[in-house]
Amino acid sequence: PEPLAEFFDLFYIGEGETVYDALFDAYKANKKAGGSRSDFLLKAAQIPGIYVPSLYDITYKEDGTIESFHPTCEGVPEKVEKQLIIDMDRDYNNLETPVVPHIKATQDRVTLEIQRGCIRGCRFCQAGMVYRPTRERDVEKLKESARTMLQKTGHEEISLSSLSSSDYSHLKEIVNFLIDEFRDEAVNISLPSLRI
């Protein structure tokens, strides 16, 4: 994120679900205590995965690459570690009651993330490299989530989302379940990002 450091107060390095609550709690606590922006940024920098550029001293080599990277305040980590959800069943925050717009949206469907990451490693795909390792969600939990989200939203289509949906090891099982379970409601199934 360093090329954009002058324009942002902080960056989150990793998958957002791991830090949302801690970051918002720190913000609310700082606001309630009457703390300054600097106070909040110092507290935020102590949350794993948060990079606050103003709290680091960075020097560059002649070619523009980073030569050194050091925190300027006590309590700020030497290295900002990328945060990942490793256990997609334990730590995944499934949004079972998504916002349903009052107008027809282009992507008017339930999105069910079946896995994160990709096994392919295609050189042209940044996401496939950035979101490693590949992590699957449990098929039984996916079935329950699909049932709940379709009932609560009234959508007539469900997208089985991932970087490469065809690589999900239980794809046949979840697709057959959706066909059988929602046959009477005529729910459509979308499979984006198929690699065959």
Where are these regions (language model features)?
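Structured alpha-helical segments in the cores of large, soluble enzyme domains
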Residues: 1, 20, 110-118, 142-150, ...
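Conserved SAM/AdoMet-binding glycine-rich loop
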Residues: 147-196
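Canonical Radical SAM [4Fe-4S] cluster-binding loop centered on the CxxxCxxC motif
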Residues: 103-140
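Flexible loop/turn segments at secondary-structure boundaries
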Residues: 1, 20-21, 58-60, 119-123, ...
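N-terminal [4Fe-4S]-dependent radical SAM core
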Residues: 53, 59-111
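Short secondary-structure boundary/capping segments
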Residues: 6-11, 27-29, 129, 173-182
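Conserved structural-core and active-site-/substrate-pathway-adjacent residues in large, well-folded domains
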Residues: 9, 50, 117-118, 122-125, ...
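Glycine-rich beta-alpha loop elements in corrinoid/cobalamin-binding modules
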Residues: 1-70
